[in-house]
Amino acid sequence: MYRVLRLLPLPLSVAISLSALADEKPPNWGLCPATLPLQGFEQAPGMDKHVVQSRPQLPTNIEGDTLTGTARTPLYQGNVLMARGDQLLGADSVRMDTETDSYVAEGHVRYQDSSILVVADRAEGNQDTDVHKISNIQYQLIGRRGNGVAKSVDIHGQVGQTHEATYTTCDPSQAIWRLRAPEIDVDNVEGFGVARHAVFEVGQWPVLYLPWFKFPIDSRRQTGLLYPQLGYSGRNGFDYAQPIYLNLAPNYDATLYPRYMQKRGFMIDTEFRYLYDDGKWQTRAAFIPNDQLRDKDRGRFSFNGYHNIDNHWQARASLAWVSDTRYMEDFSSRLVGMSSLSSLQSTVGVYGTGETWTAGLMADRWQLTDYSLNESALAYNRQPRLFFNWDKPVLDFLEFGLYSEVVRFKHDDAYLVALQNDGNYLRTGEVIRYYGGTRLDVKPYVSLPFTGASWYVTPTFGWRYSSYYLDSGIAEQLNGSRTPVRSLPIVSLDSGVYLDRDTTVFGRNYLNTLEPRFYYLYVPYRNQSDLPLFDTRAFTFSWGQLFRDSRYTGPDRQNDANQLTLAVTSRWLDQNTGKEDLALSVGQILYFKDSLVTLSDSEERIQKGKSVWVSDVAYNVNDRWTLNATYQWNPNFRRDDLASVRARYLIGSDGIINLAYRYRRNTLDGTTQLKQTDFSFLYPINPRWSAIGRYYYSLLDKKPLEIIGGLQWDSCCLAVRTVLRRHMRDRTGNMDNSIQLEFVFKGLSSVGQDTDRVLRRAILGYYRDDLYLVPPSNTTTDPDAYDPNKIP
């Protein structure tokens, strides 16, 4: 039994290493899946990580048509095949020297394992000294599109050198781009390669010369230059950033982002990441000295991280700061902790969770980032907030629970601003003083969930107790006590029935359900005019509002109620596929008495009678067409308060068309609050070309909010996107124009501005998988910023 020839692992790591430069965006191989232009072994096994890991312990089998020579120098000829695990080596002839451990393999030398396929003319070397030479190599990565050639490979142990090597993810017969290097050194011990005098070619044209560059060949990170980011916008002019990655240690690194903006000057942006067993954190800071457009120094800072204290407790922090209220608009920063365009939230706290409880101690602070507003637009700072929630099922029909928190509220004074003749906003000198206070809110409850095979009845008895200790200033504004108290019971009864039947519609078999639901709520009236409004507003009326025990988001108001919700949902489920083709829901609240509690005097009281009708429709016409609609009809004023219609059509495997109409009425004065249309698409013109666009228009303001138009050319190894964008950049309606051009060399990297974030936000379904992410609201706003463990 002879040792297996070590022809592959080191030299072909060059090929794998080049593909390791791949961008982190999801590659799209849909137009031309990975093919194997080189002939492989028919008996090659599939990818099995257990076989790969056990290679050194497996025996090597050698066979051929003939065996001649001597015991010292056996010669295998004719269809020679050496096999070990997933590794196969074939040649026309293999001569070995058992004393010196040398070998020569000639004629149609082929090597294949679960990750790569290699064809060469000749291989020779010495197993004892671990010196090898392979001539005229062609290689193909299996499962990825990487392929290329090399004139020769010299191996000395774990160090190797290739000569006249190429790499591309295109088909070998139609290589649109290719990376070529006359010399590449590879060090498997250190995990990096060095290419000298490398040339990046597009077609037959060299477009980039790199006299020397270093790159990783495995998952270990290496210090070096990342690919540049280029762009142009009306705000900044020509925009160039050159990221520099610093691999400082296995568990922490840094990235520098020197950036030049034609209209503003130079900016330095830095990011530092730290990872350890019990947590991780990252920080980012930017500074631009003497911004030429604002004539002042500007900057930002952010920090985000967590530390696992034990199995139940975790410390988390999310901090963000900008130097001025125009920073967000000018630099479109994606700060950690960014919650809106008008403000930034910083949060720090300790949070715990158990089988039946959650608890935490946290504090936050808000910073104004919109120059057209004053601090009155900010939420109250919670400094601190202590909360404890408990939910314990005792029996199948008995459940106890508790919601509780104590919060100290603070707020910055508001410095009023006014629009000047030159279009700038300046402070007027007027100041609105803000005062705070401390609030304790406790809500214990007991629930009795009775259920049957097709019904449920759940009575719930709760009590809400809220007490305050207010600053004297806010108590005087409310003409009340500094220590107001509110205490009241909350009683609800939630019940429903599930009915179904078999039915046939247009020859298709369906399971049709009828799901009526009844929700009764009783809360007695308590005068709450002496209570402040720290963190409480009215919920937007929707389907979910039909079944809440309060129509307000916070504890500062608890509405009185004597009401009954009547609602029903009906579904049509295809019995062959199990898919829900149609769902209809409609509901309304019956008010048995006037509701006297309001947020303020301007809020209209709910009168005895009927609420707005709420209806939702979801219709999956087929696998391509989807229709959704929400409609609210106010029977008291005989008007529609809200309407939303959304249609989606899927084209092929990648294309999509979205149509939407949104209308909302201001329920306080009956005026139209929002009226918009939204049309977006990714339309495949042919297998290579596709058009992209969005037209987002305000019918109320009679102006577009965002216009996007572009073309993209997509092949198996290259994508080119050109995007023209005009969008509203601030609350005052100022527009900005930009041109974005991106070249995506699939399996390598991209050059230009990152168009993905803009297109994924503007065109829901630009990446088809985004349609199925949860929650969709996070996806449509900013997919890359979605945090499933967001700090409460």
From Swiss-Prot:
The keyword ATP-binding does not apply. It is found in: Cell outer membrane. GO terms for cellular component: cell outer membrane; transporter complex. GO terms for biological process: Gram-negative-bacterium-type cell outer membrane assembly; lipopolysaccharide transport. Its main location: membrane. Coiled coil: none annotated. InterPro entries: LipoPS_assembly_LptD, LptD, LptD_C. Residues 1-22 form the signal peptide. It comes from the Bacteria. Belongs to the LptD family. HAMAP family: LPS_assembly_LptD. Together with LptE, is involved in the assembly of lipopolysaccharide (LPS) at the surface of the outer membrane. This is LPS-assembly protein LptD.
